[in-house]
């Protein structure tokens, strides 16, 4: 017996089932004869030749079935069980698709379906954009090339990038400095703004993309075939990659944030392994890491949020461990080999935190208290346990080789002590204390560097599509070495590189040709996504600085020389800013719904834009 459902006419249309052509009168479907169906001999429409239906030019769609009509009466227990099991089966098929072949999930399809509710899943538009991004990444990985892009801070920049850049990047640093949510308080990149800030910027840019796409489509619908053939197509639907910082809190915050990003239009997000509340820009000092396991939990949580939505958004795992010097906890044994402690601390020495607390109680504050901390740190030898073992047993190189072999890859500190005792005897175990030098906030000291970054990145690899090492210098050889190490265990894994404006590129010995080929050279090593995160910030600052300075001296001559003439020469559509904004599109909308509006048309004969 069919299930009782609301009466509604439902038509399922595949984007590959037919082709469309544009004409001045609008849209027209083309159908051509095809092979007859076996059941009755009726002819089926055949898709006309079209690049839109070609696998090489379109993204593979998410394997989410179309929604079913809602019920008007409750299901029986049997129907309810059938609904659940059939949905589980479809989700299992989705998870087993090639799209997720390299993604590990520590949960099941049943876990996903049980959290969805009874409303049929309809993935957000960002899922389509994610599919497009995935196809772009695949193509570049195959060709050993890279997607390179610039950070955009507003719809103007985004629209101008659309002609050359395949993707758009939204930086948390930029949002913190130019667009924050709620209180509009701008400041440095500490991720202390409301967690809706970057998603709101994404929504702003995504809606602008849709607007310019509609405007562009409408213009082409009113062109002749010859005009369309000579007018370049502009793809405004560029996947947006956004900065999710640390996830902005605990796992419930990560869950909400990932969901919000998907709903607001982000095709991909990146999350870094810094501590929320202690986060710094990747090129600043004072960074505090979370445990390896905590960041993995963040990645898993974001994926679970998207799976509930039925969305195939892309996750980028970033590590800041190359230059980090602190870690929030020693709970994860995978981090133990990089945690530093005080070696051969004199008996009776008070810990750093205890020393600082005593001095504060005595009224010592500010710079004087900083000096107390500096003196304490200068008076101890701060090393990892393995370094302490090597120093303590320097006279036994052969035994040290055995020790290094047995702790290779990392073991817990307790296990490392046991191994040292077994090899060197009790006296060979150094006096080493990782609690004594803990900071006032309780953080442990951490030995950052490439080894730590490689280990962490490999731990994050099964949970994300791309991996990002935040580097402290633009070093091509170092980046290539990092890529080689990652690809030993994860062949072909996609990598990200930040072409950061925080680097003084002119001070690193690059020739002009080195700079010209830097991106393509990195692309050969698997860095398929490369971005100048703050390009929008710097380009806006530069042109505004130059224009303001010249305008003060030369008045309108400065504007015409620096802006209007260059707009005309470069071919930017911003020269005619009314048309760029969509005024002509809106006129057509109003003329469609209300006749006799030509006299009030914003782009009528009196518009000054006709002088261009």
Listing of model-derived features with the role each one plays in the protein:
Residues 105-106, 113-115, 131-140, 149-494, ...:
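Alpha/beta enzyme core
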Residues 30, 493, 528-531:
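A short pocket-lining beta-strand/turn micro-motif at the edge of beta-sheets
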């Amino acid at each position: 017996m069919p299930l009782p459902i609301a009466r509604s006419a439902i038509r399922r249309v595949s984007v590959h089932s037919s082709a469309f052509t544009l004409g001045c009168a609008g849209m027209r479907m083309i159908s051509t004869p095809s092979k007859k169906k076996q059941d009755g001999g009726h002819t089926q429409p055949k898709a006309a030749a079209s690049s839109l239906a070609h696998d090489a030019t379109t993204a593979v769609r998410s394997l989410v079935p179309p929604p079913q009509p809602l019920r008007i009466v409750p299901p029986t227990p049997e129907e309810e069980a059938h609904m659940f099991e059939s949905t589980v089966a479809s989700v299992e098929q989705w998870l087993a698709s090639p799209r997720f072949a390299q993604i590990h999930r520590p949960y099941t399809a049943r876990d996903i379906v049980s959290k969805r509710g009874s409303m049929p899943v309809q993935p957000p538009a960002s899922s389509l954009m994610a599919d497009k991004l995935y196809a772009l990444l695949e193509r570049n990985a195959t060709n050993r090339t890279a997607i390179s892009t610039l950070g955009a801070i507003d719809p103007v920049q985004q629209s101008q990038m659309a002609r050359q850049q395949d993707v758009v990047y939204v930086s948390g640093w930029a949002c913190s400095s130019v667009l924050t949510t709620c209180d509009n308080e701008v400041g440095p990149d500490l991720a202390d703004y409301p967690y809706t800030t970057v998603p709101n910027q994404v929504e702003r840019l995504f809606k602008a993309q849709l607007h310019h796409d509609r405007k562009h489509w409408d213009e082409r619908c009113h062109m002749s075939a010859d005009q369309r053939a000579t007018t370049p197509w502009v793809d405004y639907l560029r996947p947006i990659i956004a900065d999710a910082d640390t996830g902005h809190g605990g796992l419930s915050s990560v869950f909400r944030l990932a969901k919000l990003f998907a709903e607001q239009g982000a095709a991909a997000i990146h999350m870094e392994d810094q501590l929320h509340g202690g986060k710094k820009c990747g090129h600043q000092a004072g960074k505090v890491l979370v445990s390896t396991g905590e960041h993995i939990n963040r990645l898993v949580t974001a994926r679970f949020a998207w799976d509930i939505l039925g969305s195939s958004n892309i996750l980028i795992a970033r590590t800041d461990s190359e230059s980090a010097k602190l870690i929030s906890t020693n709970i994860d044994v995978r981090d133990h080999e990089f945690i530093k402690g005080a070696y051969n601390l004199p008996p009776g020495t008070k810990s750093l935190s205890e020393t600082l607390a005593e001095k504060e109680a005595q009224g010592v504050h500010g710079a004087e208290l900083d000096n107390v901390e500096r003196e304490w740190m200068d008076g101890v030898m701060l090393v990892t346990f393995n370094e302490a073992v090597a120093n303590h047993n320097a006279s036994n190189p052969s035994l040290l080789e055995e020790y290094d072999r047995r702790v290779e890859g990392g073991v817990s500190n307790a296990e490392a002590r046991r191994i040292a005792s077994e090899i060197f005897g009790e006296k060979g175990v150094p006096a080493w204390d990782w609690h004594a030098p803990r900071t006032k906030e309780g953080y442990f000291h951490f030995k950052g560097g490439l080894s730590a970054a490689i280990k962490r990145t490999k731990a994050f690899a099964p949970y994300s599509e791309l991996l990002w090492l935040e580097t402290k210098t633009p070093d091509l050889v170092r980046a290539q070495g990092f890529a080689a190490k990652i690809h030993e265990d994860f062949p072909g894994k996609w990598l990200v590189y930040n072409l950061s404006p925080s680097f003084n590129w002119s001070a690193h010995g690059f020739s002009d040709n080195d700079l010209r080929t830097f991106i393509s050279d990195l692309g050969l090593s698997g860095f398929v996504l490369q971005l100048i995160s703050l390009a929008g910030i710097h380009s806006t600052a530069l042109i505004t600085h130059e224009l303001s300075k010249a305008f003060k001296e030369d008045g309108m001559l400065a504007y015409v020389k620096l802006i209007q003439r260059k707009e005309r020469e470069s071919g930017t559509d911003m020269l005619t800013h009314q048309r760029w904004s969509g005024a002509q599109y809106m006129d057509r909308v109003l003329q469609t719904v209300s006749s006799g509006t030509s006299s009030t048309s914003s782009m009528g004969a009196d518009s000054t834009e006709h002088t261009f």
